[in-house]
């Protein structure tokens, strides 16, 4: 009887572990899919947007510099955030920042608002660039090469597809629709990340074994 109960408990634990890893896998890949989309969905539309909102080539140049600047800032602040809040909660916050920035900028009618909210989205994505590799190491240490390949493949898809579809969508439905279409990806990433954070509660700060360091 004791052996049977032990076997059943082991099977339940193994099944829960598999479900947990599948949830983390979905969370990582969905976030990876949008780590470049705020840039590549916007860049092809800047000239069209500038005609409606009213900014010139100098501002378009500023938009071009934002990814480098915000990714650099993210690289500086992320180690402190993960040290304080843990990898999972920091990643969830990054997803939320990406969603808010990408969604809210579609309603902007001012250059300043578009710039600020793009910065917020880019900061979230920059944090994602930093935290995903250690998350892969934490949850898939036995399959780092495979997971890294999957992550890079999805990242490339998220870089290429928005750039290819931005102008056709904008021509058909307007630039705001074209931008908001790609908000659906980080929104989809929210649910699994909320689940990961809940499952990790009580452990996310104590375990720093795979966290990024400055």
Predicted regions and their residues:
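Flexible cytoplasmic inter-helical loops of multi-pass small-molecule transporters
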Residues: 2, 6, 194-214
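Extracytoplasmic
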Residues: 24-57, 75
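Residue-level signature of mid-helix packing/kink "hotspots" within the transmembrane helices
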Residues: 40, 68-76, 159-160
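Conserved MFS/SLC helix-loop-helix module at the cytosolic interface between two early adjacent transmembrane helices
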Residues: 73-112
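Short hydrophobic/alpha-helical segments at membrane-entry points of transmembrane helices
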Residues: 27, 112-118
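Helix-loop-helix hairpin linking two adjacent transmembrane segments in secondary transporters
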Residues: 142, 150-201
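A generic transmembrane-helix signature of 12-TM secondary carrier transporters
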Residues: 95, 99-102, 117-118, 183-190
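Cytoplasmic helix-loop-helix junction between adjacent transmembrane helices
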Residues: 118-155
């Amino acid at each position: 009887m004791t052996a049977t109960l032990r076997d059943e408990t082991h099977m339940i634990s193994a099944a829960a572990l598999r479900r947990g890893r599948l949830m983390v896998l979905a969370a990582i890949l969905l976030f990876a899919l949008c780590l470049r989309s705020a840039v590549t969905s916007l860049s092809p539309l800047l000239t069209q947007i500038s005609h409606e909102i009213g900014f010139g080539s100098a501002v378009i140049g500023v938009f071009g510099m934002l990814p480098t600047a915000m990714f650099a800032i993210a690289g500086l602040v992320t180690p402190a955030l993960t040290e304080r809040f843990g990898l999972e909660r920091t990643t969830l916050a990054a997803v939320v920042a990406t969603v808010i920035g990408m969604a809210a900028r579609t309603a902007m009618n001012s250059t300043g608002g578009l710039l600020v909210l793009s910065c917020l989205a880019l900061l979230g994505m920059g944090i994602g660039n930093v935290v995903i590799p250690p998350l892969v190491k934490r949850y898939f240490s036995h399959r780092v090469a495979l997971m890294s390949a999957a992550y890079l493949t999805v990242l490339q898809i998220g870089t290429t597809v928005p750039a290819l579809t931005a102008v056709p969508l904008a021509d058909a439905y307007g630039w705001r629709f074209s931008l908001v279409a790609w908000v659906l990806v980080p929104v989809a990433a929210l649910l699994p990340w909320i689940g990961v954070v809940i499952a990790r509660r009580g452990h996310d700060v104590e375990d720093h074994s795979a966290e990024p360091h400055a």
